[in-house]
Structure formats: C-alpha cells, structure tokens
Amino acid sequence: MMLKPSIDTLLDKVPSKYSLVILQAKRAHELEAGEKATQDFKSVKSTLRALEEIESGNVVIHPDPSAKRASVRARIEAERLAKEEEERKIKEQIAKEKEDGEKI
C-alpha cells in the first residue's frame, strides 16, 4: 500500500523526519481547532490533511523560531490588552448607569 503523500516527497519540504512529525501534529491540531484550511483536501482525517498542506508547500516551518515566538507573544499580549480595555469600558458604563439611576 502506497501512502499519499509519500515520505520522500514530504522530506524534500522539511529538514528531518522529526520536524515533519512535529509540523504535521501541530497543523492537524490547528485544523481540528477550526483553523482555516489553505486548500481543498482529498483526505478526511486532519492528520492527512496536514500532510497534504505540507506537501503542497502551504505549511512550512518558520525559518526563525525565536521571531515566531515573539510574534505569538505579541499577538497574545495585544488580545489580552484588548480584553482588558473592553472590560474597563463595560465597568465604566455600569458605573455611569448606576450614577444616572441614583440621580433620579
């Protein structure tokens, strides 16, 4: 039985088998979590879909892992700050409504 995509084709895209397994597992988790797919798939399983994306070159290992970590941290921090700002606005609105209610 020949598996598609073949391991030889995939190893042309990724430097090692270990890197391939890690990349495939991470991408499969992303797909299962609802991440948008980069192409139409022949496969049903997320693990095979991830391999199809790797084979097509749509998913690659980031060339600078420390830069990727920094960008992920920055995105998480921005999301946290946006959430805090939203909570602050809600608290201000509640306080204003309480104040307006006491004046009546």
Curated annotation (Swiss-Prot):
It holds the Pfam family RNA_pol_Rpb6. Its EC number is 2.7.7.6. GO terms for cellular component: DNA-directed RNA polymerase complex. One of its GO terms (biological process) is DNA-templated transcription. It is an enzyme of class 2 (transferase). It catalyses: RNA(n) + a ribonucleoside 5'-triphosphate = RNA(n+1) + diphosphate. Signal peptide: none annotated. SUPFAM superfamilies: RPB6/omega subunit-like. It comes from the Bacteria. One of its GO terms (molecular function) is DNA binding. Keywords: DNA-directed RNA polymerase, Nucleotidyltransferase, Transcription, Transferase. InterPro entries: DNA-dir_RNA_pol_omega, Pol_omega/Rpo6/RPB6, RPB6/omega-like_sf. The RNAP catalytic core consists of 2 alpha, 1 beta, 1 beta' and 1 omega subunit. When a sigma factor is associated with the core the holoenzyme is formed, which can initiate transcription. Promotes RNA polymerase assembly. Latches the N- and C-terminal regions of the beta' subunit thereby facilitating its interaction with the beta and alpha subunits. Belongs to the RNA polymerase subunit omega family. HAMAP family: RNApol_bact_RpoZ (MF_00366). NCBIfam families: rpoZ. This is DNA-directed RNA polymerase subunit omega. The gene is rpoZ.
